[in-house]
A protein has these predicted regions:
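Conserved P-loop NTPase "ATPase switch" module shared by AAA+ and STAND
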Residues: 7-31
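Sensor-1/coupling segment of RecA-like P-loop NTPase cores
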Residues: 44-68
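Conserved nucleotide-binding/hydrolysis micro-motifs of P-loop NTPases
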Residues: 24-25, 59-64, 83-87, 145-146, ...
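C-terminal helical "lid" subdomain and adjoining coupling/linker elements of P-loop NTPases
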Residues: 33, 105, 116-230, 234-237, ...
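Conserved small helical "lid"/interfacial subdomain of P-loop NTPases
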Residues: 80-124, 139-141
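A short, conserved structural fragment
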Residues: 268, 281-297
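Substrate-engagement module of ASCE P-loop NTPases
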Residues: 2-9, 36-52, 96
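Short, amphipathic alpha-helical interaction segments positioned at domain boundaries
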Residues: 297-309
Length: 309
């Protein structure tokens, strides 16, 4: 048939893998679709005498729903994805570096370990010694920020690890593209995640349109206005964490935390940035009336102030 003609080489049919991406979402609760997927995979596997292998992906195990259980005989090997798999895929596929570039990356982060290790200190996301074994592999994303992103993505996407993997792959890929032309020593800011998920969050009513429009307005302004917009993005992302999660990891949108996540130039350090934040936060609170401050034991915390709140 057409498949044999297209794939055969020298009259031999090669071992062939076919991936049915998001087959679970395609089938849904439709028993007819489940039956058709079962029939097609069985027929083709028999016809090609085991030379054809099907892999199906979904948000949860096949045993999770009655409609998918009928496929278990056809897809007998379950593979559950965990956080470690997500990190491995992003490091090996997207963040891989030429061997010639690795020594320079290694030298830069080691020279700036003082700045890196102070970020989010005192929280469960803080720098740990183990980070140093993946720092070169993760560059231009700092491990502390990767952990922050994972927490936020898990909060906004409750469908499962497969979907989170896709979200993380996309975000990491965009982060690499955004920093590709910059000098070694530039890292991706914590607020970068906002730009990747904002449109989707507006459409699902998880991001107030008022916040979205103000961020866009600030982004179109000068450097000072842009920094205000970035503060707003970060405050939104941190506020997005459920209160029990934020309490558990010890993360609050304080001046120090915001500065820790905003630093992009490791060589320049963060002292100038830290000096610039207080007047901007004051403006966002008293002039723009977009944030409010709450005084607590660990310093002043900032929260979004929208008409809805």
């Amino acid at each position: 048939g057409a498949i044999t003609d297209a794939l055969s080489r020298n009259g031999k049919f090669p071992l062939t893998l076919i991936v049915l991406d998001e087959v679970q979402q395609y089938i849904g609760s439709d028993t007819q679709k489940a039956y058709l997927v079962q029939e097609v995979t069985e027929t083709l596997c028999k016809h090609f005498k085991g030379q054809l292998l099907f892999v199906g992906t979904g948000q949860s195990a096949l045993s999770g729903t009655a409609n998918l259980q009928r496929l278990m005989a056809r897809f007998p090997v379950p593979v559950m994805l965990g956080d470690w798999d997500v990190e491995n895929v992003t490091r090996k596929i997207i963040l891989a570096k030429k061997p010639t570039a690795q020594p320079e990356v290694d030298r830069i982060w080691r020279a700036n370990l003082g700045e890196i290790s102070r970020h989010l200190r005192g929280t469960k996301l803080e720098h740990v010694t183990d980070d140093e074994s993946v720092m070169t592999a993760d560059y231009p994303i700092l491990p502390v920020r990767r952990r922050f992103w994972e927490k936020v993505l898990r909060t906004i996407d409750t469908t499962g690890t497969v979907s989170q993997l896709r979200s993380q792959l996309r975000v990491v890929h965009e982060a690499v593209l955004a920093t590709a032309d910059q000098a070694v020593g530039q890292v991706v800011a914590g607020d970068f995640l906002y730009d990747q998920i904002a449109a989707n969050l507006v459409s699902t009513a998880q991001l107030p349109r008022e916040v979205f429009e103000n961020v866009q307005k600030f982004a179109a302004g000068d450097e000072r206005m842009q920094l205000k917009g970035r503060l707003l993005k970060l405050i939104f992302l941190i506020n997005k964490l459920p209160s029990e999660t934020a309490l558990d990891i010890g993360l609050r949108a304080t001046e120090d935390v915001l500065a820790d996540l905003l630093v992009t130039d490791l060589k320049a350090g963060s002292s100038e940035l830290r000096k610039a934040l207080p007047p901007l936060l004051d403006e966002l609170q008293h002039k723009d009336r977009l944030v409010m401050s709450l005084d607590g034991g660990g310093g002043t915390e900032y929260r979004l102030q929208t008409r809805e709140s």
